[in-house]
Every structure is written in C-alpha cells, then in structure tokens.
Swiss-Prot record:
It comes from Phenylobacterium zucineum (strain HLK1). This is Peptide chain release factor 2. The lineage of its organism: Bacteria, Pseudomonadati, Pseudomonadota, Alphaproteobacteria, Caulobacterales. It comes from the Bacteria. Keywords: Cytoplasm, Methylation, Protein biosynthesis. GO terms for cellular component: cytoplasm.
Length: 369
C-alpha cells in the first residue's frame, strides 16, 4: 500500500488555505479570547454576546481541524503498521477510516464558508405549493419530507409551526422551524422554486405532469435583537386551526395570522391551542422575517448581487427533479446533478447545498475584489 505523507504544519496550511486560512484564524481566535477576558466588554451586553458567539463558532472550526489532524495521523500510523505486517484486513479498515476522514474534511471546509451574520441560527422554512392543485400539493408534501429527512440526518430537530393540508393529498403550505447548528446557513441555499416532472399517480391516463413549489428560508433570531415594528402597521387575523383532522384540531379561532402592511409580509401560527401562545409565536416569526429582509437589504447594497436575494418569484427556478421518462435531479445554478432521485428525495442534499454555498461565497468575494 502506497502511503501518503504525514501531515505537517506546511501541508496543513496548504489544505486549509482555501476557505479556512489557518494562521489568520488562530490570530483571530486569540484576539476574541482576549476580548472575552476583558471585563469592560460586558459593559455592552449585545456586543459581548456577539463576540462570544463568534469565538464559539471559530473555536469549533479550529477544534474540528485539530481533530481531523489527530485522526489522520492515527489512521496513517495504523495503515503503516498494517502494511509492514502484511495485514490486508487492517489495511482495508485503514482505507475506510481515511475515506471517512476525507468526508469529514470536505464537510469542515464547507462549514468554514458559513460566516454570515445569521448562518449559525436556527431556520424557518416555508414551503408553498404552486398552481396545479393536487399535483403541486403532493409535490410540496414531498419537499416537506425531504427537508425533514435532511435535518434529522444532520442531528437537527424539526417543528411544524403552521400547516395547511391539501384537499386530496400533500400540503398547500407549511412553515417549519429547523433547530440545529448552522441550520440557516445550510438551508438558505434552498430558497427558490423547485420543479417536479413525473407521471402523475393521480392521473388515470398516466400523463406526464410538471409541478412547482416554492421554498422560503429565513433565520430564527435572538429575542435580544431589536426589530422595531409599529403595531399600527400589523393586521391581526384569527381563524380555526386546520390540519389532518381528528380530536387534536382546535375548534376555536386559536390560529393567528399577522400581516405587516408596509411590506406585505404575512406569517401564521396554529401550533398551540391558545390564541395567546400562537400570537406570541407569530410575532417572533414576523420579527424574524423583517430581520431577514434587513439582512437582505444589507447584502444587496454591499454586493449588488440581485441573485443572492432570497425574495423569490415563480420564475426563480433553482432545481429540477425529473422522475419520468428518465431520472435526474439538476441544480440550475451550479449544474450539480445526480440520477439518484430517490436519494435526494430522502434528504441527500449535501452536494447541492455545498455547491450553492461555495458559489455564493465565490460571488461575494468577486464582488468585494
């Protein structure tokens, strides 16, 4: 077995110099540690929390690189010993370890791209079916399952905040709260229109149908972030919670919808039985939407890149899913594609997310150059 060289500080620098510059990262971490230890920092609680969050994020990235180095050195040492002893079984085990380390390194490299102001936050994900009735509703339901599977595979939790079921199948709309490290940073790459082409299971003539659904993603924001909202600018509507039915569906007008009149942004919550609780959650969601809008404006002003916006229209297709007459999922932004349609629909989205994230960061760097 031909063994690669052991890692050194030089090779480490070369490996991590693309999106995660090692020496600048260590200097930045030292600077953040010094700031956290400065008692005067805590005179401004908001600034102190921001510095602490940044230190935690960078510290986790540095530790991830250290962990990869340790595991790589161990795996190479194990492979060397197995090679000297002619132990093929142990060599196969070492190869498997190296493949796993390579996958972790690729993931760590992508994680280093998540440096946006809200990338580390939890995320709200809204899915809305397009025109087409049952077909589009079923497609929206398939997307709900896909994102739930993706989140669960990455150790994240998913709560349904609001859901409107389709008449025959699927959903008309749903709002999810995805909780986990960098949930927003990853999921923001999924904002856009998703197109499905298949032989309809609801068409007795077995004709091919095209369906659309939109995905909107925005960050869950901390309660201490100040978003000024004039109550006079918000219209409140109440209605009965809807869903799959059964004894748990509330028979009173406990669901709440808030509409921010100046922007037209509307949010709804029906998770709780209490109208008061639903109202509180809806206000949090509205603040988050307006916060995302503000982030969007900043990015647009700084980068002048309209295609970075998450404010989507039906013409903003990002991905096509073809199930018949052939099988292919293709991202229209990055050209990443795969014939493993079932794997994608089961939540295997990392290749698409990673490519879109790298493209975003590359566009941002080009704009800043």
């Amino acid at each position: 077995m031909s063994r690669p060289p052991r890692p050194t500080s030089s090779s480490r620098s070369n490996c991590s110099g693309g999106v995660f510059d090692w020496e600048p990262a260590l200097r930045k971490l030292d600077e953040l540690n010094a700031r956290v230890e400065d008692p005067t920092l805590w005179n401004d609680p908001d600034e102190a929390q921001a510095v602490s969050r940044e230190r935690s994020r960078l510290s986790a990235q540095v530790e991830a690189v250290h962990g990869l180095e340790r595991d790589l050195a161990d795996a190479l040492g194990y492979a060397e010993l197995a090679d000297e002893e002619g132990d093929e079984a142990s060599l196969d085990e070492a190869r498997a370890q190296l493949r796993e380390i390579k996958e972790r390194a690729a993931r760590a490299e992508l994680e280093a791209l998540l440096s946006g102001e809200a990338d580390g936050n939890d995320a709200y994900v809204e899915i809305n079916s397009g025109a087409g009735g049952t077909e589009s509703n079923d497609w929206a339901g398939m997307l709900l399952r896909m994102y739930t599977r993706w989140a669960q595979a990455h150790g994240m939790s998913v709560d349904v905040i609001e859901e409107t079921a389709g008449e025959q199948a699927g959903i008309k709309s749903v709002t999810l709260q995805v909780k986990g490290t960098n949930a927003y940073g990853w999921l923001k790459t999924e904002a856009g229109v998703h197109r499905l082409v298949r032989i309809s299971p609801y068409d007795s003539s077995a004709r091919r149908h095209t369906s659309f659904a939109s995905v909107w993603v925005y960050p869950v924001i901390d309660d201490n972030i100040e978003i000024e909202i004039n109550p006079a600018d918000v219209r409140t509507d109440t209605y009965r919670a809807s869903g799959a039915g059964g004894q748990h569906v509330n028979k009173t007008d406990s669901a709440v919808r808030l509409t921010h009149i100046p922007t037209g942004i509307a949010v709804a919550c029906q998770t709780q039985r209490s109208q008061h609780q639903n109202r509180d959650q809806a206000w949090k969601m509205l603040r988050a939407r307006l916060y995302e809008l503000e982030l969007e404006k900043r990015e647009a002003a700084q980068q002048a890149l309209e295609d970075q916006k998450t404010d989507i229209g039906w013409g903003h297709q990002i991905r096509s899913y073809v199930l018949q007459p052939y099988q292919m999922v293709k991202d229209l932004r990055t050209e990443v594609e795969t014939s493993d349609t079932q794997g994608v629909l089961d939540g295997d989205l990392d290749a698409f997310m990673g490519a879109a994230l790298a493209q975003r960061v590359g566009a941002t760097r080009d704009a800043a150059a």
